[in-house]
Regions:
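Charge-dense, helix-prone N-terminal extensions
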Residues: 1-132
Length: 132
């Protein structure tokens, strides 16, 4: 199976519009949560690159993948590609804790996002990505 990656075009159009359409199509708490996560990522790293990978999964990158934004029936999952290498003083990581590389945050309906802690985690990921 061929993997198709779509990166932001220079005018800021295609990928942003596709991610926005995905958010709108969800039309429930998952769309609202994904939209909020997306906004926080952009606040934490204004230079972030948005991509779509793996059959339409939003991916945010800066010198490497920061995280993905997957949606499931009962959760919005943010998977950090290098999460195991990050400090998580606020304890945001609550999924994929046993692996040697990735860590994830599962956000369920009604849960509050610790916005400051999430932005700090995004910035730490960018620092890690740019230091390699």
């Amino acid at each position: 199976m061929k993997n198709i990656d779509i990166k932001e075009d220079e005018e800021g159009g295609s990928v942003s519009e596709l991610i926005e359409a995905k958010i709108q199509a969800l039309n429930d708490w998952r769309g609202e949560t994904l939209a909020r996560v997306r906004a926080l990522i952009k606040q934490a790293d204004p230079d972030v690159i948005e991509e779509l990978k793996w059959r339409g999964v939003p991916v945010w990158s800066h010198a490497g993948i920061i995280c993905t934004g997957e949606t499931y029936k009962n959760a919005v999952k943010m998977t950090f590609a290098k999460g195991a290498a990050l400090e998580d003083p606020s304890g945001l990581f609550n999924a994929s804790l046993d692996g040697n590389t990735r860590r994830a945050i599962d956000i369920h309906e009604g849960e509050r996002i610790d916005e400051d802690a999430l932005k700090a985690l995004i910035r730490a990921t960018v620092t890690l990505n740019t230091s390699v």
